[in-house]
């Protein structure tokens, strides 16, 4: 298989974890006979420094012409007072790609379960599906005076149906349960959300559906996260709940994410930030970036075997006791990456020997 991947290393630790992603992809090429064209482009703060814009037209054009986009990290205090903010580039990139579904799998490795704030954390295995295009972030009018500020929350039926349908399709491949989170006891948009969800559910009779109010859901994520399989919710609720869910893994350096469009390339990135305090120190945890690569291989390219090989190698290295400082170890970004690559090669040799 031959695919073009645009690599947006970005800021902070982004270039370091992107290098780990590239090394993993090179090993996949070698082990499975694929070829990936890796195209580097400027994005975020580094793009502001060079071009004055966080998302140069050249970068967006390259992304649109690609088969998938990998993003390292964006932002940092260096640009806090800048006229253009790096984070604006991420919103513009999402809009330019037309992505509507942000997907965050939340799992906990048995080797690092003790780092989770919860007991029995190794039983956690769910996915948060967040709608990205509608809701209070993108609805108008938005107004502010000295005395009054107004935001508008609008959702169209087609936006709800599109994201909920995606969630049901995903659940149909997993444990066959969808939890829709809303505030239907108060908000008109949530009442429509619940109605459309029930209509979509009729098309998936083998998938269980439940509705939970967002305040109760925030509590259940901590009290009983094992009840969830696929969570689907609107933009604001998803923004908050996905961040809450991310702490269950014990470190932000562990979890990947994907943002999908109806057509065209998807965007894959670790959920952690740019971590400017450790940038350039070879301390960043590359696991979330590696898992983002695994998601890309499986979800965009249909290379499930190759994606699984990365996941298995990461798990094996963690079980061996090797880990970076954020999860209690002494490995560097490069040494942990090297260990994963060696494990991939060893597992491939064992598999062929059988």
Curated annotation (Swiss-Prot):
This protein's pathway reads: Amino-acid biosynthesis; L-leucine biosynthesis; L-leucine from 3-methyl-2-oxobutanoate: step 3/4
Q: Which UniProt keywords apply?
A: Amino-acid biosynthesis, Branched-chain amino acid biosynthesis, Cytoplasm, Leucine biosynthesis, Magnesium, Manganese, Metal-binding, NAD, Oxidoreductase
Q: Look up the EC number in the record and give it.
A: 1.1.1.85
| Catalytic reactions on record | (2R,3S)-3-isopropylmalate + NAD(+) = 4-methyl-2-oxopentanoate + CO2 + NADH
Which leading EC class covers this enzyme? oxidoreductase
Specify where it is mainly localized.
cytoplasm
Q: In the UniProt record, which is one GO cellular component term?
A: cytosol
Q: Which GO terms describe its molecular function?
A: 3-isopropylmalate dehydrogenase activity; magnesium ion binding; NAD binding
Q: Which SUPFAM superfamilies did the record assign?
A: Isocitrate/Isopropylmalate dehydrogenase-like (SSF53659)
Q: Provide the GO biological process annotations.
A: L-leucine biosynthetic process
Which positions bind NAD(+)? Answer: 76-87, 273-285
The record describes how the cofactor is bound as: Binds 1 Mg(2+) or Mn(2+) ion per subunit.
- Pfam families, sorted: Iso_dh
Q: Which cofactor does it need?
A: Mg(2+); Mn(2+)
Top-level taxon of the source organism = Bacteria
- So what does this one do? Catalyzes the oxidation of 3-carboxy-2-hydroxy-4-methylpentanoate (3-isopropylmalate) to 3-carboxy-4-methyl-2-oxopentanoate. The product decarboxylates to 4-methyl-2 oxopentanoate.
Similarity section: Belongs to the isocitrate and isopropylmalate dehydrogenases family. LeuB type 1 subfamily.
Q: What is this protein called?
A: 3-isopropylmalate dehydrogenase
Q: Which organism is it from?
A: Bacillus cereus (strain ATCC 14579 / DSM 31 / CCUG 7414 / JCM 2152 / NBRC 15305 / NCIMB 9373 / NCTC 2599 / NRRL B-3711)
